């Protein structure tokens, strides 16, 4: 693979999607081949899996089922969209990847990070990001942002209680420590303009 694979991670309301939309024009005007995508989703099969995962009424979904569905969506998205783009020398900006599964299912759901990592090693064939930006934010702040965003559809994970979202952040911080060679922690509780500038600097310093 010749391209650069950058993933953006963070708890609910950390600003991942808005950040990526802010990064795109910067790299486009530099004539960098760049593509934005998301997980779960990005292509038809994975978007269908996303719909299942996010349905509010599916509160009975068991943790292993959830982990396996995310891994399945990840596999299809990787082979159908991400890998071809990397082979065409694109900078791929992806909203979530394997670290989400480690934090949400591995830690917050209690499945164990090592078990979830092995599921995803199988799904990705050890394809890992060139760089991961983790947007750190207190759960209360992130959830308050979501509550104010009238255009954002509330999904099944948003409906979890605050203790779950606190565990997600704890899980992420463990993931950051475990993969410190790949992950850069950035404070997401700042104006989006400043966040975009900081992340651009990180990407350019680390990769370009």
Curated annotation (Swiss-Prot):
The record's top EC class is transferase
What does the record give under GO molecular function?
Answer: ATP binding; dTMP kinase activity
Q: Which GO terms describe its biological process?
A: dTDP biosynthetic process; dTTP biosynthetic process; dUDP biosynthetic process
Q: Which EC numbers characterise this protein's activity in its record?
A: 2.7.4.9
* Keyword field: ATP-binding, Kinase, Nucleotide biosynthesis, Nucleotide-binding, Transferase
An annotated GO cellular component of this protein is: cytosol
The cross-references to Pfam families, in alphabetical order and at most eight, read:
Thymidylate_kin
Record bears the keyword S-adenosyl-L-methionine: no
Reactions catalysed, as given in the entry: dTMP + ATP = dTDP + ADP
**Protein name, please?**
Thymidylate kinase
Protein species of origin: Bacillus cereus (strain AH187)
Which gene does this sequence derive from?
tmk
